[in-house]
């Protein structure tokens, strides 16, 4: 059965599981996300930039869970400035009603893309 990614895109959080590059142990984080169903691109922003352990571990077969649905994928940095800005805009637009100021996060966080497997 095919999962409707449009429905999952409205969820508040996704869970990103990475494999520790040192320990080999799985690590799961809850994170805000934006999903573009047509391209199967899942966007997240790392407030810690490329220093965050989960970002360092992402390139080793990340798994994404949204509302109980699991996906494998390939992680990468945004392809170009257009995709970089798209990721930032989609995430801030989705969470703009959340408490706190998102403008600094939008400007300084590292956009990360996970291309979800079919």
Regions from the PLM with identified roles:
Residues 11-47:
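Short beta-strand segments
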Residues 9-11, 26-28, 37-39, 59-61, ...:
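Short connector loops at helix/strand junctions that flank enzyme active sites
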Residues 1-3, 28-31, 99-100:
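A generic local structural motif
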Residues 4-7, 42-56:
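Covalent nucleotidyltransferase core used to form phosphodiester bonds in nucleic acids
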Residues 1-15:
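Extreme N-terminal tail/first-helix region
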Residues 48-117:
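Short, structured beta-strand-loop surface elements
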Residues 6, 39-40, 72-73:
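A short, structure-level motif marking secondary-structure boundaries and short turns
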């Amino acid at each position: 059965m095919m999962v409707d990614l449009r429905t999952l895109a409205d969820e508040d959080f996704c869970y990103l599981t990475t494999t520790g590059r040192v320990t080999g142990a799985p690590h799961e984080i809850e994170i805000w996300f934006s999903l573009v169903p047509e391209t199967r691109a899942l966007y997240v922003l790392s407030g810690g930039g490329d220093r965050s352990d989960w970002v360092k571990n992402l390139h080793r077969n990340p798994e994404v869970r949204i509302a109980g649905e699991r996906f494998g994928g390939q992680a990468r940095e945004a392809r170009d400035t257009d995709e970089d800005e798209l990721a930032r805009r989609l995430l801030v637009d989705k969470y703009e009603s959340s408490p706190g100021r998102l403008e600094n996060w939008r400007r300084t966080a590292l956009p990360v893309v996970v291309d979800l497997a079919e």
